[in-house]
């Protein structure tokens, strides 16, 4: 009887211990972000999962920026949360799609894969709309570079 109870508890523990967690991919990276309102270039960590992205940036070992991107909004250093469209308007450009920043941190194509060109080790995209944005974006061998010449935005992520 005790043996059967022990077996049931052991099997139950295995099922409970192996469920309910969202798998996360973690990477350390050198992150550069220059926009009209945010400027930094430091080491950090990027945590990706199916539910969103979390970015932590450190300067001299101290937390500098905490960016949490989920399906509805973007939270900046636990102080200010805003929906993705509002974040784009205030920090990036109102003309960008709401998924842009998340796609960059996840190494995914932007603007629904518009002008996607596969290259060795990744892909490139050149997207422009006269007077609104002039974007070059590449994800090649663990290095992501997003540059918008019109809005003067640069996001570089170099995997460490």
Language model segments and positions:
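An acidic-aromatic
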Residues: 51-99
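Glycine-centered tight beta-turn/hairpin loop motif at sheet-sheet or coil-to-beta transitions
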Residues: 37-39, 60-62, 79-80, 128-132, ...
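Post-signal peptide N-terminal segment of mature Sec-exported envelope proteins
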Residues: 26-49
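Sec-dependent signal peptide recognition
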Residues: 2-9
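Bacterial signal peptide processing site
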Residues: 19-21
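Mature, soluble, non-transmembrane domains
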Residues: 88-160
